[in-house]
UniProtKB/Swiss-Prot annotation:
Membrane association type: Multi-pass membrane protein
Location of the SH3 domain: 250-309
Protein name: High osmolarity signaling protein SHO1
UniProt cross-references to Pfam families, sorted A to Z: SH3_1
Cellular component annotations (GO), alphabetically ordered: plasma membrane
Polar residues bias spans: 150-175
Subunit composition and interactions: Forms homooligomers.
Similarity field: Belongs to the SHO1 family.
Amino acid sequence: MAQLDVNNIMGDPFALVTLSMAMIGWLLSLVTCVISDVQGIFPNYVWWAVTYMFVTIIGLAIVMGSQTSHVYAIAIVGYLAAGLCFTTLAVNSLVYDGSATKQAAAAGFILQSMVIIIWIFYFGSTPRSSTRGYLDHSGGAGNEHHSYRNSKPISNSYGRPETTVSGNQPPQMYTSAQLNGFETSTPIAGYPSTATDNPNNAGRFGQAPIGSQTNLTPGNNPVVGAGGISLGMGGATDPSNANEISQPTEYPYRAKAIYSYEANPDDANEISFAKHEILDVSDVSGRWWQAKKATGETGIAPSNYLILL
């Protein structure tokens, strides 16, 4: 569950400035609306706008403080769009009045409307947009905390690299006894015969052909696990190769994390990283990138949590 941390707001200039401006505008409109209501006739609708904006500002402060804006971005834009309508109607009800307090209240709603427009543009943009990327980069990585992490933000249907661990399926083990009788005794067009009764069926390098009884004797038969990973001779599993993806030697790209991410504990190939952390990336194709942290730790990372530098 996301944890609220005030440092996430204090360390983010965009969140700090916009929330401060919105709260100043709301306080200005609240005080002047109270004074105007005491002095004389006051449109009751404006109180709904004041209440709605207070709840909206508090909600956005919680979202920014817990770094869950990427989870609630669509809902945030919807609430802000409604709030922009309410503040605009409140301005229209107050700005044309000759009372100085009502005009001051209208000024407070105008300030809130300006902040709402900025928020709609920010939360309505994708993390890969240039403006959104610039605002995200303005936050210091040193002030970032692991306040929000999701171990499974992306489903496996996005083309995630499959491993014997992440597949959650027992590997299919085949021994020579199980394969007995499946050898091809009749030659097929374009393929050499692998029958064991053919004396000329020796391998090119003096070994028995693949699929022959000689090649599949107990203790020599290669066992294949799920995903086509060879488990060695005689069915012995090599733990260093069965559960890990081969590591590249070069990382020509650099990427910056736009969100925090915690690796799935059931998959040793994933890595965890914090927001604004810089990673070296070897390949930017696909939805999961092979990345390397500054500490030397390597693994796969979801591409929609990263932005290329």
